Amino acid sequence: MVGLDVTRRIVLTPDLLEYMKRLNSKTGEFVQAITKFYLDFHWEWEHIIGCVVNDPLAVAYFADRGMCSGLEAYVAIETGGIAMGQSVVDAAGFYRREANAVVLTETDPLRFFRMFFGRILKLEEKKLDLLEDLVRQ
């Protein structure tokens, strides 16, 4: 499980989108078009300048298990009340139930964006020379 607290560390910023367009204008324009709603949403509701990239991080973890780290724990999903749909993680083993999930708690945004850009732009990592500066901003 990769929760929103972790995926929210992966933000496709306007600078990253511009860099993507410079490397491959067609793909960059497409990615900008499909993320525009989210760029606007995150700014309007949270004042985040960029698009939080949730699902691609979960997929990237399966391609590179070093992308994220975490712990094995028992996880249950609340099915009623105000917390309906929330994941309840017993990280301390309080309920003494067998772990049924890997809960990812850390990620490496630079490692993610190297893979993300490399795969969607079909470029080798060495061609992504400015990426580190843009991700660490």
Indicate where each model-derived feature is located.
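N-terminal acidic, glycine/proline-rich low-complexity segments
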Residues: 1-137
